[in-house]
Amino acid sequence: MSAFTPASEVLLRHSDDFEQSRILFAGDLQDDLPARLDTAASRAHTQQFHHWQVLSRQMGDNARFSLVATADDVADCNTLIYYWPKNKPEAQFQLMNLLSLLPVGTDIFVVGENRSGVRSAEQMLADYAPLNKVDSARRCGLYFGRLEKQPEFDADKFWGEYSVDGLTVKTLPGVFSRDGLDVGSQLLLSTLTPHTKGKVLDVGCGAGVLSVAFARHSPKIRLTLCDVSAPAVEASRATLAANGVEGEVFASNVFSEVKGRFDMIISNPPFHDGMQTSLDAAQTLIRGAVRHLNSGGELRIVANAFLPYPDVLDETFGFHEVIAQTGRFKVYRAIMTRQAKKG
């Protein structure tokens, strides 16, 4: 994480303005500018574990990862630089949380790509920190205002839920498929065999729907779920609890915090990181799976049909199968055999 995003490049045009500021960086922190910008003091808060990993190496305890920021996370800051995400409800959750903690008079900067909908920050913050556009470059907008009134923030009001075949799915802003089960996950679920046993790892678990649906017809599986997203981790825990399913859920950058081996790894891996297309997570998932599968264990993933995963599967496992497909999606299966590279 060394090259700066367009949003950070816009901020750097104003770097002189930040030298005396005590800044809290938050939102979609796609690079390490928070650790490198010359300021009086810098903190960062993120809901993304992989962003925290990068920033904490340089910022130590001044980089925080959690679903909800606390007063300690914003202590002594007089400026907020918020990177607008692609998901408006996610921005609403984060900004209301942060502005409820920061003191009146705090300088508020919001920056983001135009295609992300950053313009809607003006309306969102109109009652609390009226914004004006102060720069436009690199297809991004930079907005500035001053906090005039702290909003009230109640994280519980942001929870949502929906039902899938009698299962209750709990969701939060920023969680994949927040409003219903996506088509890719439906296809993957259709391939899971009832009465399966053994240890199952759900990587990129989102709201936990794959795991609870699997556990309903295979109650003897032992579930472990992980995701980079703090909202996803909390949503999965809530989904498991709502359906009486046991499982361990934790934050992890693909396999970074995963220990041990499993009989099956399932995933609907992301191919976007913020506004950017990225195949890194899925390729890391495929290549790293061999270090976390028992002999005879399998990796089963669903992906958009156009994504170039077959080559990586063959390179890693020696072969793969397509066990279900539609015009848009394919479910891939690869077995841990002696042919597989041991990582």
From Swiss-Prot:
Its EC number is 2.1.1.172. It is found in: Cytoplasm. CDD domains: AdoMet_MTases (cd02440). It is an enzyme of class 2 (transferase). One of its GO terms (molecular function) is nucleic acid binding. It catalyses: guanosine(1207) in 16S rRNA + S-adenosyl-L-methionine = N(2)-methylguanosine(1207) in 16S rRNA + S-adenosyl-L-homocysteine + H(+). Specifically methylates the guanine in position 1207 of 16S rRNA in the 30S particle. The keyword S-adenosyl-L-methionine applies. Its main location: cytoplasm. Belongs to the methyltransferase superfamily. RsmC family. Keywords: Cytoplasm, Methyltransferase, rRNA processing, S-adenosyl-L-methionine, Transferase. Monomer. Pfam families: MTS (PF05175), MTS_N (PF08468). InterPro entries: DNA_methylase_N6_adenine_CS (IPR002052), Mtase_sm_N (IPR013675), rRNA_ssu_MeTfrase_C (IPR023543), RsmC/RlmG (IPR046977), SAM-dependent_MTases_sf (IPR029063), Small_mtfrase_dom (IPR007848). This is Ribosomal RNA small subunit methyltransferase C. One of its GO terms (cellular component) is cytoplasm.
